[in-house]
C-alpha cells in the first residue's frame, strides 16, 4: 500500500530570517511544521552562529532549490582581530593570541587581495564531504583531511568600520565562498589573526531584504490563526514568494496550451528563439503560468527538465 503523504500541498518560498544559535535544518523543520507543508528544503546551510536570509522552499518549489544554492550571496561580517580559533569563528577554541598592529594602508592592501576571482581552501569545519562524511565530523575528531582549493569570486568587499579590535565588512560573493575562511586568511595577512564573531546573510540572488520573516513572527501568526479560527492559508500563505522566483534569471519561453500538453507529458516541442545550452523558464498561455524549466535538446527542440505538478493549494 502506498504511504500517504503528511501535511498539506503548498508551493512557494519563505525568506526566513534565521536566528543565531540554531542549525539550518532545525530552522527548516520549524518552518515546515508551521506551514504544515508536506515537503520542504533549504537552499544552502548557514552556520549556527550566522543569522539572516535562508530561503525555505515548500512543496514543488523544492525542485528548484539548487538554483538558489548556486546563486550569489551577500554577507555582513564582524571579525575580532588578535585572536585565531580552531573553527575561525567564536564557537571554537582560541588557539592563538597576537597583538593587533597594522596600518590602514596594510588593511586596504589585504582587502584588495580577496576581491575578484581567487582560489579558496575550504575550512575543515564545513559541510563539504570527504569520502561520504562531512569535513566537520573529521575536524571534531582531530583529523585533518586533504581539501582541494576551489575557485570563488568576491564581486564586492566593502570596508564598513574598524572599532577597536572589531572589523566589519560587507561581502558580495559567489556560491561556495566561506566567509570564515576569508576572515581567517585576512587575519593572517594582517599578522594578528582573526575570527568571525558576527555573520549575517543579507541577500540571496535578488531576493528583497525586507521580505524576510523570523520564526517568532511565524509562531505569532500560527497562534493568531488558532485564536481567531483562521486557516494557515489565510495567515501564512501570503508570506510565500512564487516558486518561479528561484529561476527568475532564466529566459522565459511561453508556449500555447496545446504545446504545454506535450511538454507536461515529457515530450519535447518546437519553439522559436530557443537559446542554446541554457535552461529556460517555461510558462503557459496568456496567464503565463509557470510550469517548470527546460532546455534545447540535440534535435533543437525544447525538452522539459524539471516540471511542477499543477494543483490547488490546501487550507
Swiss-Prot record:
Looking up InterPro entries in the UniProt record yields:
PsdUridine_synth_cat_dom_sf (IPR020103), PsdUridine_synth_N (IPR002501), PUA-like_sf (IPR015947), PUA_sf (IPR036974), tRNA_psdUridine_synth_TruB (IPR014780), tRNA_sdUridine_synth_fam1_C (IPR015240), TruB_C (IPR032819)
- Record keyword tRNA processing present: yes
Question: Could you name the active-site residues?
Answer: 47
Q: Please give the CDD domains that the UniProt record associates with this protein.
A: PseudoU_synth_EcTruB, PUA_TruB_bacterial
The catalysed reaction is: uridine(55) in tRNA = pseudouridine(55) in tRNA
The EC code for this enzyme is 5.4.99.25
Q: Which UniProt keywords apply?
A: Isomerase, tRNA processing
The record ties this protein, via Pfam families, to: TruB-C_2 (PF09157), TruB_C_2 (PF16198), TruB_N (PF01509)
Disulfide bond residue pairs = none
Q: Which GO terms describe its biological process?
A: mRNA pseudouridine synthesis; tRNA pseudouridine synthesis
Which NCBIfam families does the record cross-reference, listed alphabetically? TruB (TIGR00431)
In its UniProt entry, what is this protein called?
tRNA pseudouridine synthase B
What species is this protein from?
Shewanella pealeana (strain ATCC 700345 / ANG-SQ1)
